[in-house]
């Protein structure tokens, strides 16, 4: 069983205290091609491309131009699971997971990324900003199409080493479309979270994002390897709701 989640635009590069066996990014040649493309963009072009403020565009320009795709170590990079710090990662709280759980996560959790493609928890990453939905073409393909074959092939390889061949999709649509479901030789399972608002159940973005992190943590900490045990998730008031679920979707409500 492998969980896939989205990355986060917010990143924290404060050093971590615990020593791990860090790993290098999977798709180094593709990263070189992408970062070299991004380095050609001036500040004003980044502002338009990414639809961000001039100040933020300057920061992104600086990040990309200081990016060294031939060197990933503690001087310029940090393990991905401790670097991303958006809502999903606030729910995950990776810095409070024990060493054994982080090591387990290395083989059971993957992050999708516009720049890195697929990222394992202990892969070292440098500061960047490139959302999968960015309107940029590489080799004549939009970004998620550029990554699709590469990511799907790598996932199939990882699943060949897994006993339970289930992909738990906790990524947003923007990122999960970078996986070719038809070419993925495993079961695909989506998970959704809904809130009861005045008697009607609705998916509310900020709550759903944090819940994705909470259930990721739950699966990792409990070493869950089957769907029936995922249904037992009952953190932060969420309960499995069969009325909104089917064989390809687990929905939790509160």
From Swiss-Prot:
A biological process (GO) of this protein is: response to hydroperoxide
Q: Name one Pfam family in it.
A: H2O2_YaaD
InterPro entries, alphabetized: YaaA
Q: Which domain of life is it from?
A: Bacteria
Q: What are the GO cellular component annotations? A: cytosol
Database matches in PANTHER family: PEROXIDE STRESS RESISTANCE PROTEIN YAAA, PEROXIDE STRESS RESPONSE PROTEIN YAAA
Family assignment from sequence similarity:
Belongs to the UPF0246 family.
Name the record gives this protein: UPF0246 protein FTM_0239
> Which species does this protein come from?
Francisella tularensis subsp. mediasiatica (strain FSC147)
Q: What is the lineage of its organism?
A: Bacteria, Pseudomonadati, Pseudomonadota, Gammaproteobacteria, Thiotrichales
């Amino acid at each position: 069983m492998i969980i896939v989640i989205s990355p986060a635009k917010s990143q924290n590069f404060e050093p971590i205290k615990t020593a791990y066996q860090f790993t290098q990014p999977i798709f180094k040649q593709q990263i070189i091609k992408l970062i070299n493309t991004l380095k050609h963009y001036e500040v004003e072009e980044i502002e338009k491309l990414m639809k961000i403020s001039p100040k933020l565009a300057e920061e992104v320009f600086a990040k990309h131009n200081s990016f060294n795709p031939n060197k990933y170590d503690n001087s310029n990079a940090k393990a991905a699971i401790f670097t991303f710090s958006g809502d999903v990662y606030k729910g995950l709280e990776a810095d409070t997971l024990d060493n054994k759980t982080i090591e387990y996560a290395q083989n059971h959790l993957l992050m999708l990324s516009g720049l890195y493609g697929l990222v394992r928890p202990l892969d070292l990453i440098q500061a960047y900003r490139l959302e999968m939905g960015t309107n940029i073409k590489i080799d004549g393909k939009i970004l998620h199409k550029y990554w699709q074959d590469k990511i799907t092939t790598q996932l199939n390889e990882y699943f060949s080493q897994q006993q339970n061949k289930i992909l738990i999709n906790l990524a947003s649509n923007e990122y999960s479309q970078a996986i070719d479901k038809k070419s993925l030789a495993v079961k695909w399972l989506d998970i959704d979270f809904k809130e009861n608002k005045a008697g009607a159940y609705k998916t509310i973005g900020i709550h759903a994002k944090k819940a994705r992190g909470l259930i990721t943590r739950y699966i990792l900490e409990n070493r869950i390897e089957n769907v029936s045990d995922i249904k037992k998730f009952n953190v932060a008031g969420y309960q499995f709701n069969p009325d909104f679920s089917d064989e390809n979707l687990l929905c939790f409500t509160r």
